[in-house]
Each structure stands twice: as C-alpha cells, then as structure tokens.
Amino acid sequence: MAAKPGELMGICSSYQAVMPHFVCLADEFPQPVRPAKLPKGRGRLRRPRQSRFKTQPVTFDEIQEVEEEGVSPMEEEKAKKSFLQSLECLRRSTQSLSLQREQLSSCKLRNSLDSSDSDSAL
C-alpha cells in the first residue's frame, strides 16, 4: 500500500498529528516561545525623536583652545620615555620567545635524529 503524501512528511493526514517516530525531533528542537506583545500605547514611553539629535554646536575657536592646552614638555618627555621602555620590553620578550622556539625545534630535530640512529643499529 502506498503512503499518503502527508504521512511521508511525518503527519497522519486523518488526525493531523505528529507520528510517534517524529516526536523525538520535537523534544530535541523545541520551538522558541515568543514573548507576548504589549498592546499599543501601553509600552514604554519613547522620547520625542527630535531630542535624540540635539547636540551642542562646536566652533573652530573651541577646537583650537583644546589643542593649545596641550601637555607640559616634562610630561611629554616622561610619556615618551615610558613608551620607549615598553617597546624595549616587548622586543626583549619576543626575542626570548623566538630563542626558546629555536632551542625547542633544534632539540626535537636532535631527538628525531637520535631515534633514527638507534633503529639503524638494530
């Protein structure tokens, strides 16, 4: 007997119910529950759209004032010294890491050569 098209998809066409062998899929992948929508007018109050776009105008003179304030030469020198010190520290740490990597790779190479020599001695 040929199966009905609805039964091929896992639905009993006479009852419109999920067939038992497809029930496990419903348990594994439950459908997400959507939150109930609030009726219009009872949601949170929104600010008027115009208030979001209001900003204080900035003039060219104000921008120049900020640039002119600047940092004292002593603070600038201190910051530069700190920056160069951190660069040097970073360089040393990367250099030591590369040396460790080279030592590790040479050690692995030496061990692999030693093991091949011992095999040939047998």
Swiss-Prot record:
User: What are the UniProt keywords, alphabetically?
Assistant: Cytoplasm, Phosphoprotein
Modified residue Phosphothreonine is at which positions?
Answer: T55
Which is a Pfam family this sequence falls into?
Answer: DUF4695
InterPro entries cross-referenced by the UniProt entry: DUF4695
Q: Does the keyword Cytoplasm apply?
A: yes
Compartments, as annotated in UniProt: Cytoplasm
Keyword Electron transport, does the record have it?
no
Q: Which residues carry this modification: Phosphoserine?
A: S72, S86, S96, S112, S118
Can you name this protein? Uncharacterized protein C11orf96
What is the protein's species of origin? Homo sapiens
Which taxonomic lineage does the organism of this UniProt entry have? Answer: Eukaryota, Metazoa, Chordata, Craniata, Vertebrata
Gene transcribed to yield this protein: C11orf96
